[in-house]
Amino acid sequence: MYHVRTFNKELQPSINSSLRLTQRPAAENDIPDYLNGTYTSRPLITVAREIPMKKEENELVDVLIVGAGLAGIGSACQLRRRSPELSFTILEARAVSGGTWDLFRYPGIRSDSDMYTYSYGFKPWVNKSAIADGGTILEYIREAADEYDLNRHIRYNHKVVSAQWSSTDNLWTVTVTRSDTQSDNEEPLIIRCRFILSCSGYYDYDQGYTPEFAGIDDFQGEIVHPQHWPEQLHYKNKRVVVIGSGATAVTLVPTMSEDTASLVMLQRSPTYIVNVPGEDPWLKPLGKFLPASWVFRFIRWKKVLLQQYIYRLSRKKPKALRRFLINKIREELGHDYDVDTHFTPNYNPWDQRLCAVPDSDMFAAIREGRAEVVTDHIDSFNSKGIALKSGKQLDADIVVVATGLKLKFGGDIAYSIDDKEVDVTERFVYRGMMLSDIPNMAMSVGYTNSSWTLKTDLTAKYVCGLLKRMNRNGYTSVTPTIIDKMGEVPLLDFDAGYVLRAQDIMPKNGDREPWKNNDKYTKDFVNLELKRNKHSELTFR
């Protein structure tokens, strides 16, 4: 049996009305409430999920969400909240949801942003921990998916390979491969959709970044990358060296050092590290007389404004902020500790991301002698450990290569428009989410100087607004279109290694709005939330 919503036939594109949607028979309780009834405002036929069809027939959905991580689940929740009349499918390349928070399983994994701004705006963070561990975040994401009945919309082991736009049909034809099938000869799955929302993250899930170290094959111990932490790795009473000084390294060090015989964090150069309270000081006082949701909103906006103040201070008075941060570290470690060598970076604050440590756990590990920081360059690996250019030898049983990520733009999807390949590096970014001259496609990309989710949440709501306008006016496409010539500026004002290594795969950034990527949440909140009906330089058809 097919469950079909009917629309004005004059507005329907020329497609098969028989559409395969899933691979198991539909039950009555499989059909969500919002599929009941007849609509006439949208130019698409929408067929319910979970309906078996012949293999050669293609399925059609209104919105195809790529990725079931933090951004993908949050975006789908916003679709359910704001556009319940739209059909959608979530394609996830991995076997489970959660994205980063399921993939990374190294000891002590936690957020490097406060959870009041990292959580969804529509789902208050009620845990007392301002910096949460990975398992708690994963539980939060999956709880949101349960609350909004998303799980039956998710297809796991489905990787998007390419997407072809047809200006005749005003639809995307998306090619998907599956990694859970027995046959290597199975043809790719074809899905057609009205709009693509890419929430696939910004890095390569399959492989982290590891520099080429001389002699690494000579090392007789274990070498691990945090992105693929061995489940059975035993480090108790072992000598461990952690290479790196970013968020992953400063998370690993205090946790692992509780059990290791010795632990050295080996860094080429220092990073700014900031102590933050594990529990927000306003939580208990406000919680005595305000509802939890009100407390959440208050602390969330307090955190937003504080983040922006610190970032703006780093741009306007970098020396003053630098001095403040370094003095705070001296207070933690004492004036006898060599802060100049190990905790004084050679760049200004927020040229790279600040690393937050809750309740001084990193500094406590150093004070208590459980961990040591060595600032030096690697000459080569040898059978016993690492030889440094200073001549020092670091013997180790385990070396953790916490050297960063490999960026991957848009999930490596090959886009084409009317059979012409799209080079995304030649396209300009529109409002931090769409690309010039590419119709009906948006990317969910967060901030580098603030919590990631603040921007992805705004993006999802803005896309819902676009789709509502299209439905209301009978449009079938929306395309960012550059009206006047403009200059080009770097897309990310950020000197992190993983960003610099990926400059050649990034799209362009204009020197004027709405083509200039914004790094200020309050400004985006006004432009995308409060003024969401003002769609300058968008072409609707």
Located regions from the model:
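Short beta-strand to alpha-helix junction loop
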Residues: W125-E143, L313-L321, P349-D361
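C-terminal, flexible cofactor-proximal segment of oxidoreductases
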Residues: N16-L19, Q23-Y39, P43, A249, ...
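Core beta-strand elements of the Rossmann-like FAD/NAD(P) dinucleotide-binding domain
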Residues: V61, D184-F195, K236, K389-I398
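Beta1-alpha1 glycine-rich phosphate/pyrophosphate-binding loop at the start
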Residues: I15-L19, R24, N29, D33-Y34, ...
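Extreme N-terminal leader/targeting segments of oxidoreductases
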Residues: Y2-V63, R81-L86, Q207-Q227
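Feature captures the FAD/FMN-dependent oxidoreductase FAD-binding
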Residues: A130-Y203
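C-terminal catalytic lobe of FAD-dependent flavoproteins
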Residues: L325-N327, E331-K384, L388-G410, P490-R541
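Rossmann-like dinucleotide-binding core of oxidoreductases
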Residues: K55-L60, L64-I65, L70, S75, ...
